[in-house]
Amino acid sequence: MQIRDLVQKYILYLFSDEVYREFIYTKRPYISAFHLEGIEQNVVLIDSVSKRYSECGIRIGALITKNKEVHNAVMKFCQARLSPPLIGQVIAEASLSTPQEYMEEVYDEYLARRNFLIDQLNQIPGVFAPTPMGAFYVMVQLPVDDTDQFCQWCLTDFQYEGQTVMMAPGSGFYTNPEQGKKQVRMAYILNKEDLGKAMLVLKKA
């Protein structure tokens, strides 16, 4: 059963987070939830400048819907606030004129980092890293019993040649924390040289 069928059958709202749409590595055409015919009034699309333009912390985005009732309800919340931060607005507006060539360079760089990181991770005994189809992070299975404890240990009690690694325990990314107990989330936002150093430190840990 397709998502559209579920939305129609159970009369659901489909909240579609599409902030990573520029970073899809499958070579397939990007399909927005708004392209699904028959559920136009049920779709609420969420977008942001923070991922596309590497502006983490800039809380500027959009909530888009064709449903007037949803729109009116959202506007009540919007009008209860003065505005998004001024500096964020200025930065976001300037970002909209970013050349397409730059976006293509960023895409190619993330793709190269992804391929490098996945290859390095899967060479470490006991580690499994699936190849993500988009975004710039990966959920990694580690040969440990509890990644919450392991991540804390790496920060407080471990170093290799004066360096350590900081990772996000996987338990925080699941409705059932047990599903991520042996996983960590890694972002490939560093250059390949630094990623290589981090993988050496992780292997030693």
Tell what function each PLM region has.
Residues 1-205:
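PLP-dependent class I/II
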